[in-house]
Amino acid sequence: MTDRPHTPLLDTVDVPADLRKLKPEDLRQFADELRAEMISAVGTTGGHLGSGLGVVELTTAIHYVFDTPRDKLVWDVGHQCYPHKIITGRRDRIRTLRQGGGLSGFTKRSESEYDPFGAAHSSTSISAALGFAIANKLKDEPGRAIAVIGDGSMSAGMAYEAMNNAKQAGNRLIVILNDNDMSIAPPVGGLSAYLAKLVSSRPFLELREIARRFARKLPEPLHKAAKKTDEYARGMAMGGTLFEELGFYYVGPIDGHNLDHLIPILENVRDSDHGPVLIHAVTKKGKGYAPAEAAADKYHGVQKFDVITGEQAKAPPGPPAYQNVFGETLAKLAETDKRIVAITAAMPSGTGVDKFAKVHPDRSFDVGIAEQHAVTFAAGLAAQGMRPFAAIYSTFLQRAYDQVVHDVAIQNLPVRFAIDRAGLVGADGSTHAGSFDITYLATLPNMVVMAAADEAELVHMTYTAAEHDAGPIAFRYPRGNGTGVALPAVPQKLEIGKGRVVREGKTVAILSLGTRLAEALKAADTLEARGLSTSVIDLRFAKPLDEELIRRTLAAHEVCVTVEEGSIGGLGAHVLTLASDEGLIDAGLKLRTLRLPDMFQDQDKPELQYDAAGLNAPQIVDTVLKALRHNSAGVEEAGVRA
């Protein structure tokens, strides 16, 4: 454990009201202490470091100038919210970040009044802030709404949809564009800072508004000419023509690490009668911590690390990660199939598409944070005879559900969905859990839905998807490493809608989908030890179901239990529907379904999350015993928790 940093000024600040008592000349030291505290905390817990380091000064300035929590501060995504949490009454718990029972790694309404809106998916902040601004306006209540959004999040259409509707909020809405990738503006200097102060000042804004009103009274040709002249003049100097076209007063670019620039500009905007305003702040991800600044990913997401050296704790060697198995398998298949194309929405390394891109760069597409586009782009490719793989996290595929339905399923186009992070995901908690994809995909006509039980099955399913041209097909797999089984040298094409019997028994049957198979086998061992002959079925497909295998299994066993890493409405519901429709439970069969509970589970270690969800071997055993009307108290006597 690292020593805590010396933070005399930070120690005096528990909430932003305390920060506002500091003198302006003390803010530089305060920001340095805040940065040191954040580095120390994340070194202990792991988490998203680089983003937070890049907004230390911006966070300080916003809370210093604005009256939070009356003024609503909405962070986009939330990766950068750690400094915000430290100075909003949560410093005493900051070393519980992303731990079970600890602070969320994102903003969370139930956690603090300083988190007015929860976030973890991108590009939502402007819409939410606009809602706060308009609500205050309608209720005639004081308060501004400030949205802080990164340049990466601006690649999603939702941000522009919000900006296109923001004009009616007037000066109650302020958008701060945190440009930490230098993708929009060049490096800023003294001239940019001077211009930003000038255009954010009340006299300049009032002069511009007078000029606008005067120009509107001119004949139409002159009015348009005056408008264009104003836009071109500011566009050449400031680079904000796009935002002005959307109805914003553009201020910037400014140095997002220079408090002497940030404070007066934020004060000018706060005191202005004109708006909405967009402030363009250029920051550096990983700022102030040399190992982060030197790293290619700027320490975006890190394990626990040594604060002095920056060296991250390394996990012990083990089986390959699922996303790497997928990426490498797809790259190998693409060597002989030129129709295979890979698409990712800003997550190349997270999905394994980076492995594919290294070998086939011309057939790899990172579309940015634009899942809707990714899916329909894949649909267009499929319609023209390509074999597109849209590799998207389960939680992010939700953002493109209409495209899945309308552009893919209805047209029966063979888009392949590689669904990463299926099931519970650990430290990222409920916002990133892949809980719903079985339910929302298996309900669609034409869709095939598979779930890999281990990394070997993932190889087979990737190949099966590549060869499936009859319509859309999806295969899901979890975050983390595989189970350690040997990878097949030659992938097999699985028969669509066919499961496999892993273990034969006579009394109990466990029908598993996905990586709960390992727990199902453990449960079978325990049940066998109690004299209950147990079958284990790896169904492989949530849709179409292996109806023949299910009928045979239900008819031959006293108790059948389905197990899946998904919400209600998934595999269990489909098996129950089949059993009910065909009268398979009329003869007294005891059929039970185990799935994720009807709640959003907070962050914890995945194995503890699944234990809480009731999807580990002991809970499977207990479900069987209760169904057989055994005394469940006897479970503990057998060394199994009831």
Swiss-Prot record:
Pathway: Metabolic intermediate biosynthesis; 1-deoxy-D-xylulose 5-phosphate biosynthesis; 1-deoxy-D-xylulose 5-phosphate from D-glyceraldehyde 3-phosphate and pyruvate: step 1/1. Disulfide bonds: none annotated. Its EC number is 2.2.1.7. Its cofactor is Mg(2+); thiamine diphosphate. GO terms for biological process: 1-deoxy-D-xylulose 5-phosphate biosynthetic process; glyceraldehyde-3-phosphate metabolic process; terpenoid biosynthetic process; thiamine biosynthetic process. It is an enzyme of class 2 (transferase). Thiamine diphosphate binds at H79, A120, H121, S122, G152, S153, N180, Y289, E371. Mg(2+) binds at D151, N180. Binds 1 Mg(2+) ion per subunit. Binds 1 thiamine pyrophosphate per subunit. CDD domains: TPP_DXS, TPP_PYR_DXS_TK_like. It catalyses: D-glyceraldehyde 3-phosphate + pyruvate + H(+) = 1-deoxy-D-xylulose 5-phosphate + CO2. It comes from the Bacteria. One of its GO terms (molecular function) is 1-deoxy-D-xylulose-5-phosphate synthase activity. Keywords: Isoprene biosynthesis, Magnesium, Metal-binding, Thiamine biosynthesis, Thiamine pyrophosphate, Transferase. NCBIfam families: dxs, PRK05444.2-2. Homodimer. Catalyzes the acyloin condensation reaction between C atoms 2 and 3 of pyruvate and glyceraldehyde 3-phosphate to yield 1-deoxy-D-xylulose-5-phosphate (DXP). Belongs to the transketolase family. DXPS subfamily. This is 1-deoxy-D-xylulose-5-phosphate synthase.
